């Protein structure tokens, strides 16, 4: 029920850009199921995104949450120049809608003034993805993206404004970032930043057509020492579930309960909604 309700009360996700200039070792957006008909690095810009959003919001008869960036990172380097995301945020604030923003980029701080306005009028939630607390490891896993220490700063500055932050803990890759030191480091960031919740439903990467081949290529390139381990343990497995998954989940649950952080997926996703309110 909570998930069904959440879908009903959110406008269809707005992905202003399709594709990405980053080169993360694992990237689900590269899967063929997302039906991208061009090279992933050849970024598709939805030039009329602002006008289309304005038109959609004018027609809506009930307030709801609008999601930006659940499939593609909205704050790619190109956004610094085009500012399409910022202009879309202005429309959301103008029409008094709520916002769910997915990002792992420090560029989001550029728009903290608008995020703050949206949050004061309705609700603003920022979902930040984290996979490691180690900056040096992140440079290999997610080259070009904002470092974990920078994302921690982003989370802190958002929560200081009263903006809700939820951490998407993903991906946790076997033999790479599934050690308990890394998990505890990630949880420490969450506790210190005062996040509302932690999502773990995408923690275990799923290899699909389109991203599987590239994942193993990147694995061999960046982590050649463990390539054979993957071949031996996972072979043709679709889901890369770490062997210490149970221990990781127990650690997350214990930490969240001790610090009042939500770890129940249904509770966090339900929080992404707004009470139904008809526009007069």
Where are these regions (language model features)?
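Conserved Radical SAM active-site core
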Residues: 5-8, 12-127, 135-139, 148, ...
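Acidic-and-aromatic substrate-binding clefts and catalytic sites of carbohydrate-active enzymes
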Residues: 45, 107-109, 174-177, 206
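Alpha-helix N-cap and loop-to-helix initiation/capping positions
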Residues: 41-45, 80, 142-150, 178-182, ...
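Auxiliary Fe-S-binding modules of radical SAM enzymes
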Residues: 5, 181-272
